[in-house]
Amino acid sequence: GAQVGARDKKVVLIVGDGGFQMTLEEIMMIRQYNLPVKIVIINNSFLGMVRQWQELFKDRRYSFVDLECNPDFVKIGDAYGIKSERLKTKADLENKLKDLILSDEGVILDCIVEKEENVFPMIPAGKTVSQMIGKKGVLEND
């Protein structure tokens, strides 16, 4: 929808592999309407946000977050006729980002990251934006 509403803008979706699976049927629209949407999948084979919460607040007692049987996102993109590629290193990503942004077509980049890579900053339950957890994994203003 963002690309349809802003045809003259570059639209980039940054999404985890779990989140992408919840909405991947939307890529049909990219192909059907030839939309130049760029999709960058952060693929750690986990429901990343939930896993991170379970790591930080539940002593790594992981429950129902492992996505070991992820589909092949590159093959899914290819099946829809969308240019798709898997990246496994930071250098690959840095090299491809420029090509991605300059492309006039829809693109899917499946970026493989460490399984337990965390995303910061984050706001813990019951805290405010001013009490977010920063880069070092500690409360900023507690």
Where are these regions (language model features)?
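Thiamine diphosphate
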Residues: 2-142
